[in-house]
Design a protein with these regions (language model features):
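Catalytic metal-binding/acid-base residues of hydrolase active sites
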Residues: 18-19, 72-74, 107-111, 144-145, ...
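Acidic, His/Gly-rich catalytic cores of divalent-metal-dependent hydrolytic chemistry
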Residues: 116-199
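A short acidic, helix-capping loop that chelates divalent metal ions and anchors anionic groups
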Residues: 21-25, 75-79, 177-179
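His/acidic metal-ligating clusters that form di-metal
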Residues: 45-115, 199
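Short amphipathic alpha-helical segments
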Residues: 1-3, 80-81, 115-118, 152
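Active-site neighborhood of phospho(di)ester-bond hydrolases with catalytic His/Asp-centered motifs
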Residues: 13-17, 69, 102-107, 138-142
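Core catalytic region of metal-dependent phosphoesterases/phosphodiesterases
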Residues: 1-51
Length: 199
């Protein structure tokens, strides 16, 4: 259903690690047992035409002063590595070496930005990020389907290139309806608990 909705809207979509594992049948080393369960369930549910569409998604998209990847910009696959406190500096260095000011990424499912301002670098999680004084940044808009920030709302961000602002948003949705559906399809309790806890 999600794939069909994306196809209808003709959005720019990039390939993630689960997409790659689903279409190749090869999960990455870090896939947990429940992650593998989801892959097996997805393989039984997703039709061939939809798998073909996923297989043809680009691993990244680069435009103007930004790049979008699922994982980390310095990872050759663009969808397996994480941007987090132990890797953000080398990923910021990668952006500097390639003259890319902004990288939008996912994979961590944690909304926020690692930045380089002058010689200062760090992480911030604010409602709005002004880009005018930032040299390079790694922006995670969060996760619509499985946030891991301790909040259960669906997360997203809006990038206004003209105003040089990224606005971060959260929106409520019927979580219990999703949980009921997961129970119906026999999803592991661990995944249901994770969704309820926003972890």
């Amino acid at each position: 259903e999600c794939i069909r909705e994306l196809q209808k809207r003709n959005f720019l979509v990039i390939k993630g690690n689960h997409d790659h594992a689903l279409v190749t049948g090869i999960p990455a080393r870090g896939f947990s047992p429940v992650g593998r369960w989801v892959l097996e369930w997805s393989a039984a549910e997703v039709e061939k035409a939809e798998c073909d569409w996923l297989a043809n998604l680009p691993a990244y998209h680069q435009q103007d002063n930004w790049i979008a990847v699922h994982g980390a910009p310095q990872d050759k696959t663009f969808f397996n590595a994480y941007v987090y406190r132990l890797t953000y500096e080398e990923n910021l260095s990668y952006l500097a070496e390639h003259a890319i000011p902004i990288c939008i990424h996912g994979h961590t499912h944690i909304q926020g930005t690692y930045y380089l301002r002058g010689k200062r670098h760090g992480f911030e999680n604010t409602d709005e990020l002004r880009l005018d004084d930032i040299k390079h940044c790694l922006v995670c808009p969060g996760s619509v389907g499985q946030p891991r920030s301790g909040k259960t709302d669906a997360e997203f961000a809006i990038f206004d290139q003209q105003q040089e602002i990224i606005q971060f948003h959260r929106t409520n949705y019927d979580l219990e309806c999703i949980v009921k559906d997961m129970h119906h399809h026999g999803f592991p309790v661990q995944l249901i608990d994770r969704l309820r806890q926003g972890r």
